[in-house]
Each structure stands twice: as C-alpha cells, then as structure tokens.
Amino acid sequence: VFQQFSLFPWLSVKENVMFGIQDQYPDKRLRGDAALDWVDKVGLAEFAGYYPNQLSGGMQQRVAIARALAPGPKVLLMDEPFAALDAQTRGRMQRHLLEIWRKLNITVVFITHDLEEAVLLADKIFVLAPNPGRLVATLPIEIPRVKDGLERDKYEPNFAAVLKDLSGLLVTSTDAHG
C-alpha cells in the first residue's frame, strides 16, 4: 500500500479489489463475494459500485488496503500510505489500520517519516540511516495501548520521552552519514 493509491480509475471499488484475487478465485461470483467482504471490512460496503474519482482520499486508501489484504498476506507492506491525507482522515485511517491489524493478526511493515505516527502505530521501530541504507537502531515501544487496546495516549509522559529518543537517533544517524 503506497502513498499514491494506484487504483484503476475505470474499475469500481469492488472491481479494484477483485483484480488482486483473480488467481485465488477463478470463479467471478466467488471473487465478487470475497471482494465485497473486504470492501465491507474497510467500511465501504455502500460505495462498492463507486469509481475512485467519486471517493475521498481516505476512502481511496481504504480501497487500496482492502485490495492488498484480500489475497490474505501474512505481511502487509505500507510505504507512507497516509502521507497525503489531512490530519483528521489520517487519524481515522490509523485507527482503521489498528483495527485491521488486531482483527487479522498480521505483521505490518509501516514506513513513515512522521515520528508521532511511528510511535502511535508501532510495537517496534527500526531506524534506518541514509546512504547507504542501514539499520541504526531498533526501538521497542512499550507504551500501553489504552483505548480499546489499540490507541496510545499522546499526552502520556512516556510518549514524549520515546519521541525525544527517536528524534535523537535520527539526528545522530543523519549527522554521521550525510
């Protein structure tokens, strides 16, 4: 799942999700049922017949997430998927992602330059240095998830401390390498 939604503009929401599961569901009816199930899981059931240009950015991103999850991956790679979204939509999408993560119990590799987003979403943060790319540090996030066992409290003192540590690691790795 990438920053740009990469949806086929000539396909409906349902058809975009169906596209990724053709091999798993050769029967078009079964493929359609599976696609509708995923569209429903991301909260877009009533928009299944809509086209991407009829959806908001957050809705388009949910379609992209449904399409990525429909084949049943064990690992979901997300490269700055919420970077282009406004703050409110980003917060909703983060919540949706956490709900999906809990429901499916899959590994999510989430790439972001937003430190707060990293601390909110991650159980473990890997800090990479540029040129050449290498692992600088691994930072386990031990801040409890309070709201429904999903969300972290941004105003908890530990949250600020982790942000400070993470910021320091980034400054150190950038200064040393570029």
Question: Which ranges hold each PLM region?
Answer:
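Catalytic Walker B motif of ABC-type/P-loop ATPase nucleotide-binding domains
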Residues: L76-D79
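Conserved ABC ATPase "signature" region
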Residues: M18, R29-F47, E99
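Conserved signature/switch motifs of ABC ATPase nucleotide-binding domains
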Residues: Y50-N53, P71
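Helical segment within the ABC ATPase nucleotide-binding domain
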Residues: R90-L104
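Conserved H-loop
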Residues: N105-I111
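Catalytic "switch" loops of ABC-type ATPases
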Residues: Q3-F8, D114
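Short helical segment in ABC ATPase nucleotide-binding domains corresponding to the A-loop/adjacent helical element
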Residues: F2, K14-Q22, G32, P140
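Hydrophobic anchor residue at the start of the ABC signature
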Residues: I65
